[in-house]
Amino acid sequence: RLNAEVTLISLADYPMPIYNGDEEVASGPPQHAVALKRMIAAHAGVFIASPEYNASMTPLLKNSLDWVSRVREGREPPLAAYRDRVFALGAASNGTLGGMRSLIALRQMLELGCGALVLPEQIAVREAADAFDEADNLKDERSARLMTSVARRLVDTAQRLAQP
């Protein structure tokens, strides 16, 4: 529908130790950080979907993004995985705010900390435990339209960025 190839990943498939600058100096970034950085860098557009923990992003997401921010291969500039691509954000929570507070923290980290281009459009799915049908589609028509709109903007922007 959106004319895009999609790669779904789970951060659980990229286990890493808690970021520690001393460990990085001693051993370099972990293999999974390099693999995740390469996965991000292989795509012109990245959609990050995450639950909310205590009004912020999950520790797993924060740690993964921190490690990826430290990976430099060859003559790459710092934060290469976050440059020259576009990010879109989504959250889901069983609360009534749908993870909206976590998106603030995630946006701040990506834009200010990593210099990433993050779309202003985002989606927060409230009451997430009951928000999806058995095929993982959003039940609420308004939320489904918003998700499609965010995805369409991500694809359109990524395609423009990828053009030589």
Which role fits each region the language model picked out?
Residues L2, V68, L110-G113, L154, ...:
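Hydrophobic recognition helices of helix-based DNA-binding modules
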Residues L2-T7, A116:
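A generic structural motif
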Residues T7, A88-G90, I123:
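Hydrophobic/aromatic beta-strand patches that form the interior of the parallel beta-sheet core
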Residues L8-G28, A131-A135:
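N-terminal beta-loop-helix "entrance" segment that forms/cooperates
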Residues G28-C114:
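Helix-loop-strand module that forms the ligand-binding subsite of alpha/beta enzymes
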Residues A116-P164:
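Glycine-rich phosphate/pyrophosphate-binding loop and the adjoining helix
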